[in-house]
Amino acid sequence: MVVQNERKEKICCFYVSEFHLEMILVPYINEKINENITILTEKKLRETLEILISKMNLKEDNKEKILKLGWDGEEKIKENSNIIIVGSKEFIKNKNEELENKNVLSVLDCYDFEKEKDGIDNIVKKYKNSLNTLGKNNFWNF
């Protein structure tokens, strides 16, 4: 039986460093802390995240929940989850293909700006919304 894709939202994000990525992601995750969140990443982000979280003004419970997410690799994909994918363009493409037949609430694809800057126009055409340090924005409302 094929599961109908119930994905409600597809968002992209561009970052210039791991700290920058985490400064974008932590408020987004904090807002969705009571929902399922799955992180699929090629990078080991836990060390920099711990430094950042220790300096942020968040509820202690939320800090703990955020730190328990899979920041050092791939988590098992949970149904009805908000998926965050961090990695190369190829990694992101492969993970999105894996998600095609899964029921997920949203997918946030996070690209390294320096590695993707020459092809950024082609990337953003695939998305309606972006996430940055100001929050979620619609690309086409500028």
Residue ranges, per PLM feature:
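Non-catalytic regulatory/interaction regions at protein termini and inter-domain linkers
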Residues: 1-142
